[in-house]
Regions:
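Short hydrophobic/aromatic beta-strand element in the GNAT-like acyltransferase core
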Residues: 50-54, 66, 90, 123, ...
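Active-site rim helix/loop that mediates acceptor-substrate recognition in acyltransferases
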Residues: 29-58
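C-terminal "cap" of GNAT-fold acetyltransferases
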Residues: 83-87, 120-123, 127-134, 138-140, ...
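Conserved acetyl-CoA-binding loop-helix of GNAT-fold acetyltransferases
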Residues: 99-116, 135-139
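A short beta-loop-alpha structural element at the N-terminal edge
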Residues: 6-20
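Conserved acyl-donor/pantetheine-binding loop and adjacent beta-alpha core of acyl/acetyltransferases
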Residues: 58-90
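A short, internal acetyl-CoA/4′-phosphopantetheine-binding micro-motif in the GNAT/acyltransferase core
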Residues: 56, 88-99, 126-127
Length: 168
């Protein structure tokens, strides 16, 4: 049975870029957005293959979460890089809505978008101590591929789009 979200999730557009930057700041646990390793996730947004979704509060229409992906070349890749034709995703939710299903709703809509664009898999990177995110990703078919150094331990995860299903 498909997950029915109480949160409207719509495709992201150029009008959402400032909110995506806010969400990147949240997703990176308040890392400097001027760091090229971080800013690559949104710099030059709107190139071919970029896609985003935005979750809205059902009562007032305020933006409460977002998810997006983009493909990277192997010589300028993100933390969750798996391959040049596998988009890397990022998901973030405003602090007061975490744990309420917003991230799950964004992930499912982003998966639908990736399928419609012909992608076969998605990848991501998440901190090893972000247990809620890891549970969400694993429930949706992502598997752990590798970890990184001990100063900023993280998991690279990947899921084939044929294995990702909506979960309750």
């Amino acid at each position: 049975m498909a997950y029915m979200t109480p949160y409207p999730v719509r495709p992201g557009g150029p009008e959402d870029i400032d909110f995506l930057w806010e969400m990147l700041y949240e997703a990176t646990q308040h890392s400097s957005l001027s760091d090229p390793a971080i800013s690559r996730y949104l710099n030059g947004w709107g190139r071919p293959g970029d896609a985003a979704v935005v979750a809205l509060d059902p009562d007032d229409g305020q933006k409460i979460g977002a998810a997006w992906y983009r493909c990277y070349p192997s010589d300028d890749c993100g933390f969750g890089f798996v391959g040049a034709w596998i988009p890397e995703i990022a998901i973030a939710v405003v602090p007061n809505r975490r744990g309420s299903g917003v991230g799950r709703a964004c992930l499912q809509k982003l998966v639908d978008t990736a399928r419609s664009q012909g992608f076969e898999a998605l990848s991501l990177s998440t901190r090893c101590d972000n247990h809620a995110a890891i549970r969400l990703y694993e429930r949706h078919g992502f598997t752990r591929l590798s970890g990184t150094d001990s100063q900023q331990p993280s998991w690279t995860m990947k899921a084939g789009l044929s294995t990702i299903v909506a979960r309750q």
